[in-house]
Structure formats: C-alpha cells, structure tokens
C-alpha cells in the first residue's frame, strides 16, 4: 500500500511539473510579444513624456544590481516548478495535497497572465519614457545590460512590470525562518534594482507594487476570485443604501483622481506625498465603490479577524478612514453595553481594550465580529478558551437576511455554550443591534419590534430604520422555517426509529410464538 501511495504521489508531482511547463510555454511568448509591442508602439509615436520626482536625480547608478534585476526571470521560471520547496513545499512527492497545489499553480498562472494584460493596457493608455540616459557599461556586467537593451526600450514605465511580477513571486514563497529572511533580502534587492539600474522611475515602481497587490486581491490562493464574486454578487439595485454609498465612493474616487491630475499639473513633483495620497485614495475608494455596488463583503477577504496583505495594501485609505470614524463616534462611550444574559454590544475593540474586557468581572470569552471593514484582535492571547466568530457585513448597507441568519445562529451557539459574548461592529449601533434583536426574538418568540426597542433601551445610539427591520424580519422567518423543518425532521426520525423498534418487537414475538408452538407439538 505504501509503495502504491508513493507511486501515485510521484505521478501527481510529474503532472504538476507538466502543468507548470504548459503555463510557462503560454506565458513566456505572450510576455515578450506584448511587452515589445507596447514599447515599439511608444517608439513609433515618439513618446517624450515622463513622470519623475525631483529627488530621483540623487538615486545612484549601480551596475552590479543588474544581476539582481535579471534574477527575477529565473525566479519566475522556478515558481512554476516548485523549486525545491521554495515556492510550494507541499508539491514534493510524498507531501501535501496535489489537488490543492494544482489549484495554487493555476491561480499563480492566472495572476501572471492578468498582471501582463493590465500592465500592457496601462502602457498603451499612458505611454511614458524614462527621462535619464544610463551610462555605458563595459565588461562582464555590460553583457547583461546589452541583453536587456536588446528587447527593453526606455518606455513601458507605469506600472513597473518587474515590480509587479516580483510582488506575485514573493507572495508564492513558502519558506520560513532564516531562509525566509534571505528570500526577503533578495526581494528587496530586486525591487531596488529597477531604480539603481535606471530602468524605472519611483512612481512606476510604486505603481507596480500596487498592481501586484491588485492582482493578488483579485486572484487569491484560496477563496473566490474577483470574477466569481462579480458573477455571484448581489447587485445594489435592490438596496438603496448600498446604491447611494457606491455612488458616493465612486464620486470620491473620481474627485481624488481628478485632484491628483490637477495637482501634478499645478504643483509638479514638489508635492509628491500629496499626489501619491490622492492617487492611492482614488484607487481605494474606487474599489470600495465596486464592493458596495456588486462584490459584497467577501471582497475584503477578511479571515480569522484579519485582512490579507493585499487588501490592507489596496484599501488602506478606506480602512484608515473607517477606523477613525469608529473611534470618533464612540469616543464618549467606548465601553460595551449589556443587553441580555451574557450578551453585550459594543464597538470593535482594540487588543488592549479586549484584554481589559476579558480580565474584567464579566469575563468576556467570545467575540462575534460583524465588521467587514475593521480588523479584529483575533490574535488575542487570552488562552485557547477564547472563541472568535465572524460574519462580515458591510457598513451602512442593508444586510442580506441569509447573513443575518448565520450571525444569529453563531451567536446562539456561543450562548448555548455558556460564553459571555461581545457582539461588535464599527459603532455597535446598527449591525450588532440588528443581529442581537433578531436573536432575542428568535429565542423568546417576542415580536422583533419589541426586541429592537429593548436593545435600544440598553445601548444608546441604536437606530434601526424600517429597511433593516424588514431584513431582520426576513432573517427571522428563515430561521423559524428552518427550525420547524429541523423539528419535523427530528420527529420523523424518532417515528421511524419507533417503527423499526415495533417491527423488531413484532418479529421477535412472532418468533417466540412459533418456537413455543413447535415445542408444544
């Protein structure tokens, strides 16, 4: 059996290598053809425009960093072949799940393809050129520069495809410990090399980093891709609040990007920090508009209380604003309020705040997180007994009844387990209040309006409008219908068990009667 398993695992590993070679055979030619096409078109159009900050003239030219620059090509090739466990240790024979590694390999290929498509589209829409002339390099290093200049012209500046690919390669690395530190040092050196070999300006390198984060967010290792979220997402047409918020974020994104263009024209590179902040905010708010318009809370990729690096990198202006908004509106009442037996409502706590709550006389030992936009202190070192649960909901949007029902069931399980639970969102006034009110109505059978009024008496600032109460009513109907269906299934199961026992008993009695009759005869 062991030999058979080893043979199957080796065969799966060979298939992975063949799959990686197939991806490489498709992406390699496409990379060179599309990149050269964009550069040649810019040369024909005689592009002279460039985006460069004044301080970049102090960046030194370091010829030896061309070795790091070229090493990325080898890393891209190795990333498709699980290079000795650097990129996918679970793919080696005898280790891990080949099906999962095949999915990760395909996602990696999709990322590189999407990255190339977006990059070339940017090159065609916004052609720029490098504004300096690199000095001539002779000797051993000069050969590497000659190979580079043979296909790479001083165009294709924003975003930096080199930095974008480096971001994707770094995300695929699976090393740990000292080797991870060495790998990170290599990543840093390759990233710096695009500047010290005078191939890219700073704004192009930063744009490449942003593009890499965007691709990682759109095509994660696990979970639905952006295409799946768009296809399965709930349109904002049926939710006026989501529709209004999507338009507000879209307008804010347009305003930031317009000010970004206007600011560059007026201020030049003298206000680089402001320009970068406006550009980043425009991107973050534009993506937030998509989240509200179609994608839903799953697009923020929140897991175990935290947001992945790609989401933090892309959305940080929006996330920072959401956190500041939460702290500003709850500055006078940061403490949670007791609304039912072992159930409390409050804002999303910080780590220290949660530590104080856990050490208090109430002894909080569970957290139900309803805020899609705020990271939770899920790494709280309160021992293994502390329970974290989450059903992310969008701030300001009318929640889906299915999501409300899931949150109510999780709260009910925590309560039945004897947990003292803090139900939290950004302010502790809308999402948390709705879930707790539906849970109270579900448990007690009281009208939802009475449960909402009871929560509002305990937590100042609770305000649930008619649309949210209707969503709560729909969630309550779903929960009650499922409970009745579950009760019916349980009664049917008991009836079937009783029937089986009756049949067994009848058969046993018949057998005894036949045995007695045989003995009498």
Please provide the spans of the model-predicted regions.
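N-terminal transmembrane-helix/juxtamembrane module of multi-pass inner/ER membrane proteins
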Residues: 1-76, 135, 293-307
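Cysteine-based protein phosphatase catalytic domain of the PTP/DSP
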Residues: 141-148, 323-423, 427, 438-483
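Aromatic-anchored segments of alpha-helical transmembrane domains
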Residues: 32-33, 116-122, 185-198, 256-262
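Membrane-embedded alpha-helical segments of multi-pass membrane proteins
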Residues: 68-75, 160-165, 206-210
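Membrane-interface loops
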Residues: 40-50, 54, 84-181, 190-191, ...
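Membrane-interfacial, low-structure loops and terminal tails that flank and connect transmembrane helices
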Residues: 1-17, 89-100, 224-245
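Interfacial helix-loop-helix junctions of multi-pass membrane proteins
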Residues: 157, 188-215
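PTP/DSP superfamily signal
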Residues: 223, 227-325, 334, 409-420, ...
């Amino acid at each position: 059996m062991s030999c058979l398993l080893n043979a199957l695992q080796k065969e799966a590993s060979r298939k992975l290598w063949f799959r990686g070679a197939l991806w490489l055979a498709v992406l390699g030619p496409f990379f060179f053809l599309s990149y050269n096409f964009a550069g040649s078109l810019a040369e024909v159009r005689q592009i002279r425009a460039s985006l460069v900050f004044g301080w970049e003239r102090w960046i030194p030219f370091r010829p030896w960093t061309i070795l790091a620059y070229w090493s990325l090509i080898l890393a891209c090739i190795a990333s498709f072949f699980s290079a000795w466990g650097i990129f996918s240790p679970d793919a080696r024979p005898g280790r891990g799940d080949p099906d999962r590694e095949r999915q990760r390999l395909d996602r990696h290929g999709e990322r590189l393809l999407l990255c190339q498509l977006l990059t070339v589209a940017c090159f065609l829409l916004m052609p720029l050129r490098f504004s300096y002339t690199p000095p001539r390099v002779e000797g051993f290093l000069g050969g590497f520069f000659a190979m580079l200049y043979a296909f790479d012209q001083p165009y294709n500046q924003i975003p930096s495809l080199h930095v974008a690919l480096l971001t994707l390669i770094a995300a695929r690395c699976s090393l740990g410990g000292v080797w991870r530190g060495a790998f990170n040092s290599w990543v840093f050196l390759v990233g710096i090399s695009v500047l010290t070999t005078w191939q890219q300006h700073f704004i192009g390198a930063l744009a490449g980093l942003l593009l890499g984060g965007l691709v990682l967010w759109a095509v994660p290792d696990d979970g639905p891709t952006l295409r799946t979220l768009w296809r399965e997402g709930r349109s904002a047409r049926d939710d006026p609040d989501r529709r209004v918020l999507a338009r507000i974020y879209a307008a804010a994104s347009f305003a930031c990007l317009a000010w970004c263009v206007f600011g560059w024209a007026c201020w030049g590179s003298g206000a680089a920090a402001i320009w970068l902040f406006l550009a980043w905010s425009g991107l973050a708010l534009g993506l937030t508009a998509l989240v509200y318009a179609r994608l839903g809370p799953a697009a923020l990729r929140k897991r175990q209380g935290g947001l992945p690096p790609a989401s933090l990198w892309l959305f940080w202006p929006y996330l920072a604003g959401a956190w500041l908004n939460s702290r500003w509106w709850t500055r006078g009442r940061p403490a949670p309020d007791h609304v039912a037996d072992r159930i409390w409502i409050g804002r999303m706590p910080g780590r220290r705040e949660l530590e104080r709550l856990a050490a208090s006389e109430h002894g909080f030992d569970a957290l139900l997180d309803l805020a899609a936009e705020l990271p939770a202190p899920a790494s709280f070192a309160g021992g293994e007994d502390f329970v974290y649960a989450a059903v992310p909901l969008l701030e300001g949007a009318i929640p889906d009844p299915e999501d409300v029902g899931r949150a109510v069931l999780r709260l009910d399980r925590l309560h039945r387990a004897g947990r003292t639970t803090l139900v939290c969102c950004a302010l502790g006034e809308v999402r948390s209040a709705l879930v707790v009110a539906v849970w109270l109505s579900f448990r007690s059978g009281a009208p939802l309006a009475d449960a909402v009024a009871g929560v509002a008496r305990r937590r100042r600032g609770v305000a649930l409008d008619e649309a949210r109460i209707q969503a709560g009513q729909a969630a309550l109907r779903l929960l009650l219908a499922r409970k009745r269906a579950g009760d019916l299934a349980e009664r049917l199961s008991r009836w079937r068990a009783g029937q089986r026992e009756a049949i067994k008993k009848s058969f046993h009695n018949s057998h005894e009667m036949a045995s007695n009759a045989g003995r009498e005869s």
